[in-house]
Amino acid sequence: MRLVPLVWAYIEMTTMRIISKGNSDRGLEVDLSTKLGQLELPAPSLSASGCAASGKELSQFMNLADIGAIVTKSILLEPRSGRATPRMAETPSGMLNSIGLQGPGIDQFIEDDLKWLEKNQVRTIVSIAGNNAEEFGRIAGKLRKVGENVVGIEVNISCPNVANRGLVFACQPESAHEVISIVRRTIGGSYPIFAKLSPDVTDIVSIAKAVVDAGASGVSVINTLLGMVIDTQLMKPALAGVTGGLSGPAIRPVSVRA
């Protein structure tokens, strides 16, 4: 797993704070605070969902309380074992992953991971996923009474490596609207909700409008692109699941265009 970009961002932020502190007597200050909809963060750097699980992996490299927030790996209602291995394959400008939403389920996640994050005072955005709209609502309901360190929810309606492609809600405005509406009704008020959009659509703007109309505070753009890598030694797909989600520098121009 490549941690260089996030670690480098942390180094840059730390350096800016040191410079600011060292020159405070000269009236020089650096304000890194960022506002995402209703959500106010002290710094603009967030981890991408999936890259750091619940954040424990990154804690050996940095103080997680120094970045804007940790975005957790997407959590389902029930535990899931995920896909067979191999699950990851490197590409020239990124990597493919085919994890299959492996996770402990929301109850165990709250008991173990969220307690650890709260203990370490880590601002957290919990990413949630579901097999149907009702499941999204049930997970959101369980997050209503968690600690104050949970500052928002990312609603993953676009994971491209789930075996049944029929469950990708982000491909249609109507289904995307339905999921966000249920989450908003369940969580209530102006609590920050961000819809994670899929690049595998012909009109991402219509999807974005639908989720905002349904109550989303903003959108997370973009999820991985579906791809495949061939193992030229074995002459077969490198991933056990055949296809996987492409992430990394290769998809940045696609995200910017969206």
What positions do the PLM features span?
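N-terminal capping/small domains of soluble enzymes
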Residues: 11-124, 129-131
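N-terminal active-site wall of soluble small-molecule enzyme domains
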Residues: 34, 38, 135, 202-204
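Alpha/beta enzyme core
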Residues: 137-258
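Short, conserved acidic/polar surface loops in the N-terminal third of protein domains
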Residues: 81-85, 110, 136-139, 165-167
